[in-house]
């Protein structure tokens, strides 16, 4: 806490809610800052108790370690490179980031996974406010877009016959069932799928699917 007060470090996002409850203040007041890159919920669609939020999200810069399929001979070697990246590798990249967006969230970025293999990329990233990053840090500029956002709670998990699902498991349901039923198709503006984790152990969080209305 003393390092935080002295400006030597920032609090972990996963502890903010608990700290705010203990101190009986909002998270914004706790940080003494406005949440950066705010997004706007324009509609909520409920299916069997599961909420799917239609979100307008402004342009976002994501930075960290991004692996590009074009640098690999085949899909298997690309997938192996993703799997071989260790937690230490990811944290080493995160520690080099400049001007990280608050609050801090770990994000898995899936680029063009519904397209040809060579057009794909996969990243372990966080939001930042500048493209000027350290050597070895990859940056992806996510355009402003409409997204479908879904959380990994029990009601949503039960839609895919689970009590608790992982974020990535929601993408197929959203793409194959939710979108056709509610007048959406994949966005074609360069926006990408994101897994945004809200716990330190990456057990829960939000699936973001970039879409446009039909």
Segments the model singles out, each with a brief description of its role:
Residues 1-10, 35:
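Recognition helix of helix-turn-helix/homeodomain-like DNA-binding domains
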Residues 6, 10-13, 18, 40:
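Extreme N-terminal leader/targeting regions
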Residues 14-29:
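DNA major-groove recognition helix of helix-turn-helix/homeodomain DNA-binding modules
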Residues 29, 35-214:
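A solvent-exposed interaction/effector surface
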């Amino acid at each position: 806490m003393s390092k935080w007060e002295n400006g030597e470090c920032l609090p972990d996002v996963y502890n903010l809610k608990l700290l705010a409850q203990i101190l009986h203040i909002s998270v914004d007041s706790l940080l003494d800052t406005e949440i950066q890159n705010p997004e706007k919920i324009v509609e909520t669609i409920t299916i069997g108790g599961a909420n799917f939020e239609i979100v307008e999200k402004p342009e976002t810069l994501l930075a960290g370690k991004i692996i590009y399929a074009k640098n690999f001979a085949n899909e298997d070697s690309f997938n192996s490179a993703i799997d071989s990246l260790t937690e230490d590798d990811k944290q080493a990249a995160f520690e080099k980031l400049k001007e990280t967006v608050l609050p801090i969230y770990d994000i898995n970025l899936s680029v063009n996974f519904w397209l040809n293999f060579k057009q794909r990329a996969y990243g372990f990233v966080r939001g930042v406010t500048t493209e000027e990053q350290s050597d070895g840090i990859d940056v992806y500029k996510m355009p402003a877009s409409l997204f479908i956002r879904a959380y990994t709670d029990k009601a949503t998990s039960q839609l895919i016959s689970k009590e608790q699902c992982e974020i990535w498991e929601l993408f197929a349901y959203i793409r194959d069932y939710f979108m056709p039923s509610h007048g959406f198709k994949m966005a074609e503006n360069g926006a990408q799928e994101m897994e945004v984790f809200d716990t330190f152990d990456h057990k829960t969080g939000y699936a973001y699917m970039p879409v446009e209305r039909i």
